[in-house]
């Protein structure tokens, strides 16, 4: 039986979860990075985000799931516990910030894979950093927020989202 993602005031670490970031990054870089696409929603004049839907509405968007066994194991582990219907890789490009927005799903889960000290989620006078240390985070998307990558390298997160 699955449950809704744990509500968060802003961003919280989900206890008792730890993932091997090196394995996740290896599988992404080796098999999936080639599929990532630019996101241009018309609100930004520069490229801020690149994204790949790995899993959407209970279906993999990638046909060779056997090449990413560790990632597939994590998706199964999380879907056995939490309700969500989309898994994405999201690059946030260096020296960029997104617009203020509220997402459709109230909360989502993030596993930071590649980050730097210039990467921040920003809410009403509050900035929060999520290190790529193997942790799972719940992020409140129902409050106005943005994200910033003031570093020189792209930031990469694996995200689990509710689309409705």
Residue ranges and their predicted role:
Residues 1-81:
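Non-heme Fe(II)/2-oxoglutarate
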Residues 75-94:
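A short glycine-rich, His/Asp/Glu-containing loop-to-beta-strand
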Residues 91-93, 102-119:
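Short, conserved beta-strand element in jelly-roll/cupin
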Residues 97, 118-119, 137, 142-148:
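Histidine-centered metal-chelating micro-motifs
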Residues 102-104, 123-124, 149-152:
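Short glycine/proline-enriched turns and hinge-like loops at secondary-structure junctions
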Residues 107-112, 136-138, 152-164:
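A short hydrophobic beta-strand segment most commonly corresponding to one strand
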Residues 114-132:
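A short beta-strand-loop-beta hairpin characteristic of the jelly-roll/cupin
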Residues 128, 133, 140-142, 147, ...:
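Conserved SAM-binding loop
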């Amino acid at each position: 039986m699955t449950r809704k993602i744990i509500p968060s005031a802003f961003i919280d670490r989900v206890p008792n979860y730890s993932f091997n970031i090196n394995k996740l990054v290896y599988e992404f870089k080796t098999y999936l990075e080639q599929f990532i696409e630019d996101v241009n929603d018309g609100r930004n004049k520069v490229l801020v985000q690149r994204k790949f839907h790995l899993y959407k509405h209970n279906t993999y968007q990638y046909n060779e799931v056997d090449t990413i066994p560790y990632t597939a194991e994590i998706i199964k582990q999380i879907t056995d516990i939490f309700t969500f219907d989309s898994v994405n890789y999201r690059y946030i490009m260096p020296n960029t910030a997104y617009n203020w927005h509220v997402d459709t799903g109230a909360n989502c889960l993030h596993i930071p894979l590649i980050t730097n000290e210039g990467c921040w989620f920003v809410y009403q006078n509050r900035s929060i950093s999520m290190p790529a240390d193997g942790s799972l985070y719940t992020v409140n998307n129902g409050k106005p927020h943005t994200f910033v990558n003031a570093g020189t390298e792209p930031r990469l997160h694996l995200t689990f989202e509710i689309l409705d």
